[in-house]
């Protein structure tokens, strides 16, 4: 994979795609699905206050629906997003 390092207080995240089915069992195409808002953190830029913002590579997060810039790396979808658009960290 090409290495992408976010600049400033930004993250590189990979959306977690969940297969969406109707109640009747029909799998919906990507164009009919809502944009995913869960992602895995792939790279972290320079965070000014790391104690306040405890996000690291591998964490799963929920982000603002229309935030960030979508990019493709090796035919995979990623988003470069500002840390302020991260709404929550998912702990499993």
From Swiss-Prot:
CDD domains: cpn10 (cd00320). Keywords: Chaperone, Cytoplasm. One of its GO terms (cellular component) is cytoplasm. Gene3D superfamilies: GroES chaperonin. It is found in: Cytoplasm. GO terms for molecular function: ATP binding; metal ion binding; protein folding chaperone; protein-folding chaperone binding; unfolded protein binding. InterPro entries: Chaperonin_GroES (IPR020818), Chaperonin_GroES_sf (IPR037124), Chaprnonin_Cpn10_CS (IPR018369), GroES-like_sf (IPR011032). Pfam families: Cpn10. Its main location: cytoplasm. GO terms for biological process: chaperone cofactor-dependent protein refolding. Heptamer of 7 subunits arranged in a ring. Interacts with the chaperonin GroEL. Belongs to the GroES chaperonin family. Together with the chaperonin GroEL, plays an essential role in assisting protein folding. The GroEL-GroES system forms a nano-cage that allows encapsulation of the non-native substrate proteins and provides a physical environment optimized to promote and accelerate protein folding. GroES binds to the apical surface of the GroEL ring, thereby capping the opening of the GroEL channel. This is Co-chaperonin GroES.
């Amino acid at each position: 994979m090409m290495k992408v390092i976010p600049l400033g207080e930004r993250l590189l995240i990979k959306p977690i795609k969940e297969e969406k089915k109707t109640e009747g069992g029909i799998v919906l195409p990507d164009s009919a699905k809502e944009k995913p808002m869960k992602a895995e953190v792939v790279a972290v830029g320079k965070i000014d206050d790391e104690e306040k913002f405890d996000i690291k590579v591998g964490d799963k997060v929920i982000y603002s629906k229309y935030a960030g810039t979508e990019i493709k790396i090796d035919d995979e979808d990623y988003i470069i997003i500002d840390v302020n658009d991260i709404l929550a960290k998912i702990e499993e």
